[in-house]
Amino acid sequence: ETDRADVKVLRYREDKGVLSIVLATSPFYAEMGGQVGDKGTLVSGGLEISVFDTVKVNDTSICRGKVTKGEATPETMGGTFTATVDNERRKDIRRNHSATHLLQAALREVLGTHVQQQGSFVSPEILRFDFSHFSAMSAEEIQKVENIVNAKVMACLPVCTDIMNVDEAKASGAMALFGEKYGEDVRVVKMGEPGCEFSRELCGGLHVS
């Protein structure tokens, strides 16, 4: 993961003032798994593009942006760009995404291991976590979950990632999103002391370190 890189444009198109850009390599993280995409800038000579979203279409990462200086032509788009991610925004996304992992672990501790993630939304400002349970949570249960999550945040748990075979990852106890299709190798995000992690999930998103 990096927040700045020199990049080349593979292809682009413009529609009503909005550029859709495919880069040869990209520091921008695309929206996926409920996590919103990165924003930032692309600068080459006198051309400046404000990237307001990054999405993934058929496994291709696409930056969507608008020209803020200069003009996008085949010539100006053919140069080398400096791609810069809005890193402060990304830090907030990291925090909220890691919080959803802590939240799921806390929910399973308080409500039971039947709790399964059904969806999520992670942005710099808010997070939403959808999960299955038999009934509405009581005020006492909500408070217990909140206390656990806050305690884990204050404990500054170590966070590490591993690339593992998907079957080995699931066998190790890593949580997977029900119905999600995974490749042969997956990224596992672990929070807590090695061997006794509080949270262990299959996840390709951004997290605190």
Where are the model-predicted features located?
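A glycine- and charged-residue-rich anion-binding loop/surface
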Residues: E1-S209
